């Protein structure tokens, strides 16, 4: 079972509710002109091409890193994360979150139970020589993220049956207001321990309304 909680060193600013894709009244946190410099220092820019094509890293008190990106066109989390790493290595702009830069991230809260079909009904052999297959594999994921930090709990269960993953001159707007990808990674590790892509904000926030 995976269970983690993390806190940001400083609390991000609660922003006004806004739009996300086709939805309105979405709760946001982030950085605006009123935000303290210490909060800006806990954000690292990985790369920035536009307000809808970028990646950032949020630092925590623990050794967890929250990576958020937009504009990725790859088809799976492995390729998206690889692309983020490559784009970050090539980026020549400022990786510091500057005084005029803005950040807007939606609050996230979901409790998801999904069936992992790719491992079902594939035979494997135990050390006792008996052959089994996974009849049904389920994974439950609880994840929350807000201006203070976040937490994640993930557990899997399965049933068996016997058989016969420098400041820039212009201000930058990091707007997470449409489809985005989020990764959680331990500092110093090559790969993340959690990934999610969010396109329908109504699945992770209550009280949002369709435009």
What are these regions (language model features)?
Residues 1-211:
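Hydrophobic-core positions in well-structured secondary-structure elements of globular domains
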């Amino acid at each position: 079972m995976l269970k983690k909680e993390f806190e940001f060193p400083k609390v991000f600013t609660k922003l006004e509710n806004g739009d996300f894709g086709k939805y309105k009244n979405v709760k946001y946190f982030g950085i605006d002109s009123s935000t303290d410099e210490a909060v800006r220092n806990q954000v690292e820019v990985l790369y920035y091409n536009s307000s809808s094509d970028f990646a950032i890293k949020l630092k925590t008190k623990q050794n967890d890193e929250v990576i958020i990106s937009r504009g990725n066109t790859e088809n799976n989390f492995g390729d998206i994360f690889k692309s983020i790493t490559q784009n970050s290595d090539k980026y020549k702009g400022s990786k510091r979150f500057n005084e005029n830069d803005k950040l807007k991230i939606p609050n996230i809260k979901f409790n998801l139970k999904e069936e992992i079909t790719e491992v079902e009904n594939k035979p494997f052999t135990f050390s006792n020589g008996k052959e089994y297959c996974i009849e049904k594999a389920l994974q439950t994921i609880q994840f929350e993220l807000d201006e203070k930090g976040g937490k994640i709990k993930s557990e899997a269960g399965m049933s068996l049956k016997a058989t016969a993953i420098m400041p820039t001159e212009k201000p930058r707007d990091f707007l997470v207001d449409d489809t985005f990808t989020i990764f959680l990674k331990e500092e110093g590790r090559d790969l993340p321990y959690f990934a999610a892509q969010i396109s329908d904000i109504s699945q992770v926030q209550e009280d949002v309304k369709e435009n």
